[in-house]
């Protein structure tokens, strides 16, 4: 039996190598004839941890898809044929290996799982042994020791991406992806046998990717935003020279022993692979700082753990290059100097960067540097927008544009909280981002991967991880309920019963966890606390005044939080509907019974009477049982869970929303407030809430802010609320039966004079147009796809 496999690695790999992030190059020469150029040439390829595949210097694809756990590993197929030449060809692979072991915080990428066995897997499916590029037939390989993978230089916190680089380049790897490169000093790879490789990535555990390859699009920067530390005439000259360079109209020659600082802008916030091209300039140093915006740094403050920590900078006009500074992540590159105008020295960092602005600090040594080109290859999930809505208020259209862009920037091989800081897939964030995706594209491929990642993250106590896939365990109890809502949302849009059956055991475990933590009063007890001070983090929202992400009462009395009881109640209600849909009436009945008990317990222990400044008294839900602390959040979920009637909910919301006496929701929680206002028939009052987004436009943002309290990141897709509201509420198209078999058309025009558009659904396109005729009366025109029923008689809808 041949126990050698197509899993290969470099023989000289040491134990020290296995505790650092490393990049390893692989290349193989092979011959293709005219017949090969006419036929598909498919290989299967994977790696631990990441690969980039090239043929004759041309980028083909990257992968594998991020693993969801350590039980399976994804494998890709790639067609080499479009890149082949008649004669000698080179297939080349860059593998980024993150260590399985952890040394402090200096070598980890928190969302990228790996095994104990570094490998590259290549299997040629052509079948011709003489021309095969399969791994076990021999490749040349070499560690690129010139590249050091470093963290994000955050002394006060985690470095969850760990993909910055410090490069001291030489000509050793110049043109290594091309035919003619001398690899005689490289090692021959060794093929792993079946007993050497991890069971996770054994051939029988390789599974095809479940999402499409990421998109790649070559783009140019658009303007020079600033030249630093130069006189007036030099600034004018350099601005013109660098502008020509980024437009592809000329080079910039930087004299020897010179320092230049240039700040370059993209049209909008981007995720992309930076590409530099140089000629000459041996020993020049390029320091690259990627930033989302211009900001105003604040003084460091004492840390509770000792020492000083950086504070989040203040932000205003994001384009204020005159008064603001660029702050962000830094990488370093020292130029080798072998490049010419005809054959430039090229550098492309391995991981994509997130940026709107780039600061380049260029310090030449003893010879001048010719900066030939600086551009990027935009990347992300291939999101195709099928929904478009046109309204009479131009600010809605502008908010739509920045929101769609934000969602796109937060979609890669997973949903991401923010692509700049963390690149982690959290349950609360992802739930509404998935809904936004359904509403504008009817694409559930990434959503299915997301739900599966959380399903596999379940712990023995029933909780799922707050983010998944994840290298480390961490629980935010309420986030497990958002996972249940994900499954319910998918039911309404796609109606996949098999998916629900697969996830229901995990849902039951989550609900069981909450049930085990009920107090004698029947409400959920203290199940979490502040981050790092409790086993679980009871995060609810980044509301102003909630420094730990939860009300102050979480550290008072019993520590129980009403909102966690409400989330449990909401989860029971939605789980009952899921059980109904897959015809499990006994389970549905059990969930509803527990839900009614929870409603009774909340009713008896969590309501208080708040005295308003005008002397009136208002019945409100407290943030904690018996605690005189109140928020909009609890009033909104009282409506969503049916704790109060729509009339009562209207009074509660109108009392608290916008009232500074009560904790107000950040943009992260605004989706749930909008749903409550919809139920209470005060949706028209949401217009003033859009002022948060109008503020973003006023501050010249091109994406939506992470939160409106500290504004840490300028790009976080839980803020892409209008992607849901515009088609679903304002245009009025929403599913009201599983699988979108039935639709409700119920517009909320508010102050708008007209709205029309097309909404893509899994069943097909729905077109709707509302307009005011010459007599001042509203009219409707609409069309539905075959097989879809409109639940309400739209001709009877009265639009104010």
Model regions and ranges:
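Non-catalytic C-terminal accessory modules of carbohydrate-active enzymes
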Residues: 151-175, 593, 600, 687-800
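Alpha-helical repeat scaffolds
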Residues: 648-657, 686-689
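Heptad-repeat amphipathic alpha-helical coiled-coil interaction surface used
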Residues: 484, 491, 569, 573-576, ...
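Extracellular/oxidizing-compartment recognition motifs
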Residues: 1-417, 429, 445-446, 450, ...
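Alpha-helical support elements that line or immediately flank enzyme active sites
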Residues: 273-292, 358-363, 427-457, 487-494, ...
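Solvent-exposed loop and edge beta-strand segments that line ligand/cofactor-binding
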Residues: 263-266, 348-349, 414-427, 468-480, ...
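Active-site acid/base region of carbohydrate-active enzymes
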Residues: 132-141, 357, 365-402, 408, ...
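Catalytic-core region of carbohydrate-active enzymes that cleave or remodel glycosidic bonds
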Residues: 668-699
């Amino acid at each position: 039996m041949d126990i050698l496999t197509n899993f290969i690695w470099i023989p000289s790999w040491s134990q020290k190598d296995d505790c650092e992030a490393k990049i390893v190059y692989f290349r193989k020469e092979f011959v293709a004839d005219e017949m090969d150029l006419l036929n598909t040439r498919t290989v299967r390829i994977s790696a631990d941890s990441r690969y980039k595949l090239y043929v004759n210097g041309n980028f083909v694809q990257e992968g594998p898809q991020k693993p969801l756990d350590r039980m399976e590993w994804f494998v890709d197929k790639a067609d080499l044929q479009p890149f082949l030449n008649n004669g000698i060809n080179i297939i080349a692979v860059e593998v980024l290996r993150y260590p399985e072991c952890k040394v402090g915080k200096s070598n980890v990428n928190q969302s990228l799982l790996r095994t104990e066995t570094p490998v590259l897997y290549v299997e040629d499916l052509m079948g011709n042994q003489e021309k095969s590029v399969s791994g076990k037939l021999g490749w040349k390989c070499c560690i690129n020791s010139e590249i050091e993978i470093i963290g994000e230089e955050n002394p006060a916190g985690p470095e969850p991406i760990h993909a910055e680089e410090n490069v001291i380049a030489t000509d050793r790897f110049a043109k290594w992806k091309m035919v003619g490169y001398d690899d005689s000093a490289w090692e021959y790879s060794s093929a792993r046998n079946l007993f050497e490789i991890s069971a996770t990535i054994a051939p029988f555990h390789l599974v095809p990717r479940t999402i499409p390859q990421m998109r790649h699009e070559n783009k140019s920067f658009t303007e020079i935003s600033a030249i630093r530390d130069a006189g007036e005439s030099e600034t004018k000259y350099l601005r013109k020279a660098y502008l020509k360079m980024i437009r592809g109209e000329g080079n910039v020659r930087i004299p020897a022993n010179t320092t230049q600082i240039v700040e370059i802008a993209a049209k909008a916030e981007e995720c992309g692979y930076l590409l530099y091209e140089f000629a000459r300039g041996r020993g020049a140093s390029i320091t690259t700082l990627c930033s989302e915006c211009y900001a105003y740094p604040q003084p460091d403050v004492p840390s509770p753990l000792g020492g000083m920590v950086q504070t989040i900078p203040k932000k205003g006009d994001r384009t204020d290059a005159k008064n603001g500074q660029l702050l962000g992540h830094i990488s370093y590159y020292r130029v080798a100097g072998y490049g010419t105008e005809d054959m430039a020295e090229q550098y492309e960092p391995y991981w994509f960067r997130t940026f709107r602005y780039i600061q380049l600090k260029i310090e030449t040594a003893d010879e001048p540097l010719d900066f030939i080109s600086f551009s990027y290859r935009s990347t992300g999930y291939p999101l195709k927008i099928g929904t478009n809505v046109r309204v009479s208020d131009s600010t809605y259209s502008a908010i739509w544009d920045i929101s769609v862009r934000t969602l796109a920037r937060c979609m890669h091989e997973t949903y991401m909280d923010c692509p700049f800081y963390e690149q982690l897939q959290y349950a609360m964030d992802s739930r509404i981002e998935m809904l936004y995706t359904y509403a504008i594209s009817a694409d559930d491929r990434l959503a299915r991967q997301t739900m599966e990642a959380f399903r596999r993250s379940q712990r023995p106590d029933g909780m799922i991880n707050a983010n998944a896939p994840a290298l480390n365990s961490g629980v935010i109890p309420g986030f497990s309920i958002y996972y249940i809502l994900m499954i319910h949302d998918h039911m309404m849009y796609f109606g996949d019963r098999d998916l629900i059956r697969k996830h229901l055991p995990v849902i039951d475990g989550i609900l069981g966890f909450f049930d085990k933590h009920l107090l004698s009063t029947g409400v959920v007890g203290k199940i979490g606390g502040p981050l790092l001070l409790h086993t679980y983090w009871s995060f609810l929202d980044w509301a102003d005044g909630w420094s730990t992400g939860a009300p102050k009462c979480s550290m008072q009395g019993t520590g129980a939080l009403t909102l966690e009881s409400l989330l449990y109640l909401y989860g029971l209600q939605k789980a009952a509907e899921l059980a109904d849909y897959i015809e499990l009436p006994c389970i549905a009945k059990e969930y509803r019974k527990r839900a009614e008990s929870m409603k009774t317990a909340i009713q008896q222990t969590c309501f208080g009477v708040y005295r308003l400044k005008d002397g009136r008294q208002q019945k409100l839900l407290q943030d904690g049982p018996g605690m005189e602390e109140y928020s909009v959040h609890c009033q909104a979920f009282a409506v969503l869970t049916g704790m109060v009637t729509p009339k009562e909910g209207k009074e509660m919301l109108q009392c608290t929303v916008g009232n500074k006496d009560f904790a107000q929701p950040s943009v992260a929680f605004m989706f749930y407030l909008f749903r409550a206002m919809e139920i209470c028939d005060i949706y028209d009052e949401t217009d003033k809430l859009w002022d948060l987004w109008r503020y973003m436009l006023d501050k010249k943002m091109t994406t939506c802010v992470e939160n409106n309290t500290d504004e840490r990141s300028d790009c976080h897709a839980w803020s892409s609320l209008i992607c849901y509201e515009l088609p679903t509420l304002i245009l009025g198209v929403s599913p009201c039966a599983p699988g979108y078999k039935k639709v409700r058309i119920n517009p909320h025009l508010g102050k708008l004079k007209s709205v029309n558009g097309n909404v893509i659904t899994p069943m097909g396109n729905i077109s709707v147009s509302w307009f005011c005729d010459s007599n001042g009366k509203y009219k409707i025109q609409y069309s539905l796809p075959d097989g879809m029923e409109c639940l309400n008689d739209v001709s009877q809808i009265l639009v104010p």
